[in-house]
């Protein structure tokens, strides 16, 4: 009975979201110069590519040829699948086509600069079993210096393989979500629930379910990359499985931790469109002051990217510590059962 009670507490010992955010902020300021160097040297090219691609995708006219072709293809797929015409699906089609275009445009930078930044930050925050005892006792060790290039290079293949697998998993999550939406609207059509009110209600429920499914998949894939960067010999599907085990019972905490940094990146993207893209369209040229502002906004976006990596590393470490504590709690109970 005691053993069952111990198992029932599994998944509730991880640090809450506020504690993880405080620890991540503490780690960031402890290694401020190192992390900002990573943001300026590695994350900045990726952030600039994302901002430029977002601006090109959101341009009213003329839209890129690839974006127009992608939007037309998605529109044809939605019509062939039987989705009813509604503002929700029109907005979903536009946003999905912009997301796919931005992902494809920034993919070379994501596979190089972003993954190198993740490997570098994870190497700085990795637990070192060979470190002195006084450092191991600290809850969140400080960051002394940038990691060696060899350590980052050794971790890069595992990070790359896990990132590519995560991209396919995200594609599968989107396909599964759209399949469920198609089944829901097909069932509503068979039951005669085709009024505007029912369509609006199903669209709202579908938006919530789609956001949750894609959000959880994104959290798992992001954490899997951190696992691949911090755990030697763990890459690809093994890293994804370990990430799934780590967030078991902590999905709400993982989603809450992903929200602040993603809001920061979204704010930087909106600020770039308001301060840089709008002035570029109005004046017809990019003034030096506007170019400097664009560089500053891209750097802010890069800092948010680095903060997201730090939060993921700290959260994974808290999950590992929670699992170790649960195992230590179970050991005396199992010994007592054996003696009995």
Predicted regions and their residues:
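Hydrophobic alpha-helical membrane segments
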Residues: 1-340
